[in-house]
Structure formats: C-alpha cells, structure tokens
Amino acid sequence: ITMNTLNQQYEEKVRPCIDLIDSLRSLGVEKDLALPAIAVIGDQSSGKSSVLEALSGVALPRGSGIVTRCPLELKMKRRQEGEEWYGKISYQDCEKEIEDPADVEKKIRDAQDEMAGVGVGISDDLISLEIASPDVPDLTLIDLPGIARVAVKGQPENIGDQIKRLIQKFIKRQETISLVVVPCNVDIATTEALKMAQEVDPDGERTLGILTKPDLVDKGTEETVVDIVHNEVIPLKKGYMIVRCRGQKDITDKVSLTEAIEREKAFFNDHVHFQTLYNDGHATVPKLAEKLTLELVHHIE
C-alpha cells in the first residue's frame, strides 16, 4: 500500500496549508513570519537518511560520517494516480529540474559540495528538493546534519559545535516540530539529539520520537523498546513511532522502496514483541507519514 491510505479529507485540508507555507517560504516571508516546519535530527548513523528516503521514495546520500552537510528541505507533494514523477533541486541562485528519481542522490551531493566545499565542511545554506509523485505524502521536512561526537580527519575541531549550532537554530523556533531519530540498539536517554530537543522543548510539546533499526535491538531489551514507544519512559506529547527502513544490506541486495514497505509490514506483523506496536498504529513508515501530516496540520491550526 502506498501513501494513498491518507484520508481524502486531510488531503483537502492539508494540501492548501502546505502549499501556502511553501509559497510564503519561497517568497522569503520566513524572516518576519515564523512558518511551521518539521526538522529531522539524530545522532550520526541513527538511520535518519533511511527514514527520509522511505518517506520520499528517493535515495538520498547516506553512508558513515557526515552525510547531510547542509540543511535539506524536502518538499513532497502528492500527485494524482497516474501522474508523472517530478523533481526539482534549488540552492543559492541555482534551480535544476530532475528527470529521473535515480539522479536525486548525485544532485544533492553536487549541491552540498558546491555549498559546503568538497569533502568535510558543513554549511548553513538550505538546499531545497521538491518531489511530486502519487507515492509521497504531502509534507515538508527539513533534514539537518547528524550530530557528530568527534571530528574526523580534515574536519574542523569544532565540527560538533558547528552542527549543534545549526540544529539549534532550527529547532529552537516554537513553530518547529522536532523529529528525533533514535536507533533501537542504543540507550535513548543518552542520545544527543533527544537532549538537544529537550533543551529547547523541555515539556516535549513539539517533539516526536522515531525509533529505527528494530531488527538490531539487543536481545532482552525488546520490552523496553515497547515501553518507550508507549510513551512510558521519556514521555513526549507527540509520542513515538517505530519504523524499519532499508539497511545497507537491503540496498546492496537492490531491495526497492516499495518492497521495503512490504518487508517492514511483515517484520512488525510477525514480531513477538513489536506486533502490538503495529496493531496500535505506532509502527511502519506509511503510519509515520500519516501521523506527520496530521501533526503538521494541528501545529498550523
């Protein structure tokens, strides 16, 4: 099932809101009027890019180390069944249409190299990627660089602070919903991304947690993960979702995004511990897409 499960009524309510926000943002109204946005943050290797990739249906730059080197605004617009896929990338004074979904990753890498320098720096400038297709939800997300603990060769010593400063700039605004991506195989309480979200949003009013990599969960900690998603460990007003996206092996094995959604559903459906989360509507990427769209609308209202 693609995103077509999103109710028509939200389609009618959501689309006008999102179009309005996008056009205001492109007119530069941002400066005087704070527009609602969803910012995606996570420690490095949290599975952030995989979540965005699953939502957008296109491959984004991924790998170890700093992959997202500039803020990437991902504008997704849902098209009618049968309509063509459309893509466009804009940054600085440059705007290019993208013919083929397979070219997106390279175009983003080129744009990042142009803006942040080839290699290892980061930049505050926004790259905007617009995608229209029958298979995406109506959503605009801003992907921010992963939080790095230590600088690698060639990076400025203070790269960690630079990234934090950049993230802070986005998430401290009251209009921003922070999407905090945390893998199931780490202790959520120690993740830097959640700490940062808590600093700017102590009551968890506008923070939503996403747990990734449930297939890598340490044996014996599954029930803790269930408790986290049930909002019983670190409560957030917007709660938690759990997803399983393509890992490196799936990509090597050429598992398509559509196939990955089927596999994800089967994974949760058959999982002794996580099945309840699936039944409660707390699991899978399509459910996440639905929740994000609703959250954005509530936030706008």
UniProtKB/Swiss-Prot annotation:
Principal location class: cytoplasm
Gene3D superfamilies referenced in this protein's UniProt entry, alphabetically: P-loop containing nucleotide triphosphate hydrolases
Annotated segments matching region G3 motif: 143-146
Subcellular location: Cytoplasm
Residues involved in GTP binding: 42-49, 143-147, 212-215
Span list, region G2 motif: 67-69
SUPFAM superfamilies assigned: P-loop containing nucleoside triphosphate hydrolases
Entries under PROSITE patterns matching the protein: G_DYNAMIN_1, G_DYNAMIN_2
Gene Ontology molecular-function annotations: GTP binding; GTPase activity; microtubule binding
GO biological process, one term: receptor internalization
Region: G4 motif, residue numbers: 212-215
UniProt region (G1 motif), positions on chain: 42-49
Cellular component annotations (GO), alphabetically ordered: cytoplasm; microtubule; nucleus; plasma membrane; presynapse
Segments traversing the membrane: none
Key words, A-Z: Cytoplasm, GTP-binding, Nucleotide-binding
Description of what induces expression: By interferons.
Every Dynamin-type G domain range: 32-301
Region (G5 motif): 244-247
Annotated family: Belongs to the TRAFAC class dynamin-like GTPase superfamily. Dynamin/Fzo/YdjA family.
Name listed for the protein in its UniProt record: Interferon-induced GTP-binding protein Mx
Organism: Perca fluviatilis (European perch)
